From Swiss-Prot:
Species name: Varanus albigularis
Subunit organization: The major hemoglobin component (HbIII) is a tetramer of two alpha-2 chains and two beta-1 chains.
Lineage: Eukaryota, Metazoa, Chordata, Craniata, Vertebrata
GO CC annotation terms, alphabetical: blood microparticle; haptoglobin-hemoglobin complex; hemoglobin complex
Function: Involved in oxygen transport from the lung to the various peripheral tissues.
Name assigned to this protein: Hemoglobin subunit beta-1
Residue positions binding heme b: 63, 92
GO BP: any one term: hydrogen peroxide catabolic process
Amino acid sequence: VHWTAEEKQLICSLWGKIDVGLIGGETLAGLLVIYPWTQRQFSHFGNLSSPTAIAGNPRVKAHGKKVLTSFGDAIKNLDNIKDTFAKLSELHCDKLHVDPTNFKLLGNVLVIVLADHHGKEFTPAHHAAYQKLVNVVSHSLARRYH
């Protein structure tokens, strides 16, 4: 994947402003609410019975932070995302058996959450750069499935 200097700047400058715990928790909660079938991967998280329960679930928040911390690793390694996610791809495929479509769904929710938090600062150029990034990340996470 080729990243322009502008894309790298847009991604990195916005990422430096986010609260990984807050955005991660909201992103994972959004995935579980909007796409309820994804909850089967997280049944051990306890109460996922309603949007309020999901949003307030400390395990959802903690795992969302973990997910976005890994996403931050991709941002630090934009030119080597596939290798950055090689072990996570193996884990999600071989051990956790996550449907690889869920990676793209999570990425799309992340873009929405970022847009919600950053308002007018999240320009169409930011949207395009982050959409490209989540597509590359989801493809890298799904790599082991191919």
